[in-house]
């Protein structure tokens, strides 16, 4: 999945390697969508789910968490439950790692190192569901 630069805080395109499990869930979700363009549609048919919708759903469910907190949970899981490379886990979150000089030389997207992380994360999430 490609997140366009204009949607990213860093204004740089971010490629997210989706696991087979996530791709299957997205394919399954299509049947509930009212749009060919969006998998998750909002209240207005054919329009995407709004930016604040997930937060509103969590609030409705009386959950004491935020969408951004999911990122923290992922990072903590990577650090405490896996032995994945620090740089690769940071790249999963689209974090800039190292000094400006190091960043100038690290130009790859690390997709081959990030894919197994996302596969294992999907399995972990599914095991808790």
Residue ranges, per PLM feature:
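Active-site/catalytic core of tyrosine-dependent DNA strand-transfer enzymes
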Residues: 7, 12, 17-65, 73-74, ...
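Residue-level "hotspot" positions that anchor or transmit function at local structural transition points
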Residues: 66-67, 109
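Alpha-helical structural elements of signaling/regulatory helical domains
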Residues: 32, 81-84
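Active-site-proximal segment of tyrosine recombinases
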Residues: 65, 75, 83-95
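Catalytic-site neighborhood detector that most strongly recognizes the C-terminal catalytic loop/helix
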Residues: 2-11, 23, 46, 83, ...
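Short beta-strand motif preference
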Residues: 1-3, 16-18, 89
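Active-site catalytic microenvironments for nucleophilic, acid-base chemistry
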Residues: 60, 77, 81, 124
């Amino acid at each position: 999945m490609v997140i366009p630069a204009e949607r990213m805080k860093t204004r740089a395109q971010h490629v997210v390697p989706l696991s087979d499990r996530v791709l299957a869930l997205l394919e399954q979700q299509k049947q509930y969508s009212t749009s060919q363009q969006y998998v998750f549609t909002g209240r207005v048919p054919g329009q995407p789910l709004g930016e604040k919708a997930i937060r509103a759903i969590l609030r409705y469910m009386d959950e004491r968490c935020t969408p951004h907190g999911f990122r923290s949970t992922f990072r903590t899981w990577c650090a405490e439950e896996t032995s994945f490379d620090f740089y690769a886990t940071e790249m999963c979150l689209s974090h800039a790692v190292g000094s400006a000089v190091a960043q100038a030389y690290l130009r790859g997207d690390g997709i081959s190192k990030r894919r197994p992380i996302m596969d294992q994360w999907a399995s972990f999430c599914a095991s808790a569901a």
